[in-house]
Amino acid sequence: MSFASETKKELTNLEMKECCEKSELSALLRMNGSLSFSNRRLSIDIQTENAAIARRIYTLLKKGYDVTVELLVRKKMRLKKNNVYIVRLVEKSREILADLHIVRDDFSFIRNISQELIEKKCCKRSYLRGAFLAGGSVNNPETSSYHLEIFSLYKEHNDSICELMNGFDLNSKTLERRKGYITYLKEAEKITEFLNIIGAHNALLRFEDIRIVRDMRNSVNRLVNCETANLNKTIGAALRQIENIRYIDETVGLDILPDKLREIAQLRRDYQDVTLKELGEMVSGGKISKSGINHRLRKIDEIAEKLRAGETVAKK
């Protein structure tokens, strides 16, 4: 089961206040429902591939309106051939849609979220929970980039969801897709806040555990890469220094170098694996700092480059 499916399964087991049940159900019917007329009767089909969500819708309708509800199961014939669960409402369809503020009394469609559904903070959380159950998805934090989104067919409703989320300081953004609109989150911290808002506390804990391990692994990798880069840089510098010292020795001899440079050149040539700090501790006349050793080695590099350019180098 995917991380998103586990999250939704957890949400379908939450208990709610009566006012919150109405808010969640409104989001579920608005986003997953479709209307049809048969034998001069209006019916509502709420379709989902998630059995737990279908049971949730069925229970909320029975509890809230005491109506006859049908639960149908069909199998997709394409792609994954998953089961499709259809919750069918044939009684009081018009009255329920009006009560859930999906249509007006004249049966015109309400495209945004009615304020009556989200007057209380608990109801705002419940509407977002219903919206996530109906059209939401969240990436597995273990295998991909952090991303949570809620899909809506209508721009006005999508903008309302974004506004509702940002009322909780989530910094959500909207984007137009080919067949609708999405409100999305990209920051890991905001995704965990959203999971907390809608009541997915187990999913939140798992997300955070994975995120901590993942961030720690990334930090270690960055540190290792940095250490490797520094090591490669150090090795490259040492090889260059040794090559330059050999070139000077074979061309004009190390005796051409000033005494201080000649001593460092001989030490670098004879002890190729030691660090600059260790070289500084090996010189006669007292310890020299790494920067001091580096300075002398740069002077040796300059002399080697002059010799390669055909210039004459006299001993100073």
UniProtKB/Swiss-Prot annotation:
| Cross-referenced Pfam families | HTH_WhiA, LAGLIDADG_WhiA, WhiA_N
Keyword Cell cycle recorded: yes
Q: Name one GO molecular function term.
A: DNA binding
Q: Name one GO biological process term.
A: regulation of sporulation
Alphabetically sorted, this entry's keywords are: Cell cycle, Cell division, DNA-binding
Determine the domain of life of the protein's source.
Bacteria
DNA-binding region(s) in UniProt: 275-309
Which InterPro entries does the record match to this protein? Homing_endonucl (IPR027434), Sporu_reg_WhiA_N_dom (IPR018478), Sporulation_regulator_WhiA (IPR003802), Sporulation_regulator_WhiA_C (IPR023054), WhiA_LAGLIDADG_dom (IPR039518)
The record ties this protein, via Gene3D superfamilies, to: Homing endonucleases (3.10.28.10)
What function is annotated for this protein?
Involved in cell division and chromosome segregation.
Write out the similarity annotation.
Answer: Belongs to the WhiA family.
Q: What is this protein called?
A: Probable cell division protein WhiA
Name its species.
Bacillus mycoides (strain KBAB4)
